[in-house]
Amino acid sequence: MRRLLAPLTLLFAVFALAACGSDDDAGNPESNLTLEEATAPLEGASPQLAAVREDANQVLDEGVEGYEERIAELKGTPVVVNKWASWCVPCRREFPWLQNEAIEHERDVAFLAVGGNDSEDALETFLEELPLPYPTYYDPDLEIAEGFGGPRQAFPATAFYDSSGELVYTHFGVYEDEEALAADIERYAR
């Protein structure tokens, strides 16, 4: 059994790195949101969702504790968490889809992000181009990402928490299209 583990681990690592692709895979998608749209107050929403929007497009260096505290504060609301890095081309490809879905579900699903394996400056520069209507938790050592299960080095990854705050599913790799992402939101973010 142990003899199989090392080759399988190596094979999985190769596939995980390949998932990040090249610039030809995703091009350079346009943002669906301006900075003003992404950071506009979320009026009429629950206090928890309004608080998430107050931190929109910010990189929060609060560690695992800050992230877990936010998840606990959102109990009663399903949460979608996308793990990304500025150098990951498939992450860039998914950003417009995540922008759309976050706005579409802004009153019933919380969205958060985890930026890992990257510098804080690189994450902030990336967000100037593709702003998010929710915060990114800085995770340089992938400690937050470890809680998603699976390989910490897999980018992108999208984790789904149900309204009780339990992690119910993590999708590793890029979504095929926005419809596949939307289907997982409907299936798991309850």
For every predicted segment, state its role.
Residues R92-L130, P140-G147:
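Structural microenvironment flanking redox-active thiols in thiol-disulfide oxidoreductases
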Residues D55-V79:
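A short beta-strand-turn-helix
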Residues M1-D61, R190:
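N-terminal targeting signals for export/organelle localization
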Residues F126-P133, D139-A189:
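Thiol/disulfide oxidoreductase modules built on the thioredoxin-like
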Residues T77-V79, W84-W87:
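Short pre-active-site segment immediately N-terminal to redox-active cysteine/selenocysteine motifs
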Residues S86-R93, P156-A157:
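C-type cytochrome heme c attachment motif
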Residues P78-V79, V109, P156:
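Alpha/beta-hydrolase fold active-site loops
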Residues V81, L112-V114, A159:
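Conserved hydrophobic packing residues within short motifs/helices of P-loop NTPase cores
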